[in-house]
């Protein structure tokens, strides 16, 4: 984990202009790097989620020991820069977002990135987690950003919850009410419904979390037996199932994956995030949060 944190901080973008495209850049963001030579085209999937999930990693490492906390203290300035990248994707009174896809209405929802300013439900659930981490990190002296993370968190939580229309969550907050999901469409419409409970924007055992999880499984319940509905395995579904204590489906999926592992094989497109999400699911089932 320390190696990854060091690598990530060494890759931070430290100027407000993208050297590859000449376009505006968010300081503290990180590009995608490829292969052993770590080449980049100056692009990323998002700024908001990358920063948010990184802050969560930092918090979890700091909680393990005082030694880890002291190690991170030495990197306080750079970690604060990552927090600022997340902050600078969030639509607030002091930050005007591009309005290509949505309104600048100070709702404390994040956009994915400057050149694709969409307020995604999935990203904002991750950002909500990142704001919780940032609040903890600031309280523990590991970042020094001059913002009130409690306000950011409360406002972001309220706006994510407001994307629920009584039946489903909108998968993005587009202009003029766009973003209403088609639940027969796996990505992003259906699978995004699992994210508010998974990232605890709403309680995982709440009526809404159970309702959207049940709806998801009506159309895509065969995930547990190994059916894929996308190019990737999406093991994060198993993690969502674990947070709602669906032991049967999680155990069925784990047996499916073990059927590959026992033969020294892997499921197609089995990347680190897929393995990590499944390990989190197993851990949650074995150590349920009471």
Locate predicted features:
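Short glycine/serine- and small hydrophobic-enriched flexible loop segments
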Residues: 56-63, 129-140, 198-201, 239-243, ...
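Aromatic-rich carbohydrate-recognition surfaces in CAZymes
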Residues: 1-90, 121-124, 250, 254, ...
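Extended ligand-binding clefts on enzyme/binding-domain cores
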Residues: 17-18, 39, 43-49, 73-77, ...
């Amino acid at each position: 984990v320390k190696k990854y944190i060091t690598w990530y901080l060494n890759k931070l973008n430290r100027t407000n202009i993208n050297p590859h495209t000449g376009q505006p850049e968010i300081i503290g963001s990180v590009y995608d790097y490829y292969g052993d030579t770590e080449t980049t085209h100056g692009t990323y999937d998002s700024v908001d989620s990358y920063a948010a999930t990184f802050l969560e990693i930092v918090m979890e490492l700091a909680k393990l020991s005082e030694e880890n906390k002291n190690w991170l203290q030495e990197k306080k300035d750079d970690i604060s820069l990552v927090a600022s990248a997340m902050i600078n994707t969030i639509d607030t009174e002091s930050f005007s977002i591009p309005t290509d896809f949505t309104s600048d209405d100070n709702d404390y929802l994040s956009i994915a990135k400057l050149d694709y300013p969409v307020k995604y439900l999935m990203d904002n659930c991750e950002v909500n987690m990142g704001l919780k981490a940032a609040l903890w990190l600031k309280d523990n002296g590991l970042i020094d950003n001059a913002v009130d993370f409690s306000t950011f968190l409360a406002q972001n939580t309220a706006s994510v919850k407001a994307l629920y229309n009584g039946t489903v969550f909108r998968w993005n907050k587009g202009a003029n009410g766009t973003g209403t999901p088609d639940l027969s469409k796996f990505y992003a419409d259906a699978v995004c419904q699992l994210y508010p409970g998974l990232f605890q924007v709403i309680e995982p055992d709440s009526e809404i979390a159970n309702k959207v999880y049940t709806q998801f499984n009506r159309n895509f319940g065969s995930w547990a037996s190994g059916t894929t509905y996308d190019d990737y395995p999406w093991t994060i579904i198993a993690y969502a199932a674990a947070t709602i204590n669906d032991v049967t489906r999680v155990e069925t999926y784990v047996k499916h994956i073990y059927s590959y592992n026992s033969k020294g094989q892997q499921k197609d497109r089995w990347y680190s995030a897929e393995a990590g999400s499944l390990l989190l699911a197993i851990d949650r089932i074995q150590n349920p949060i009471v």
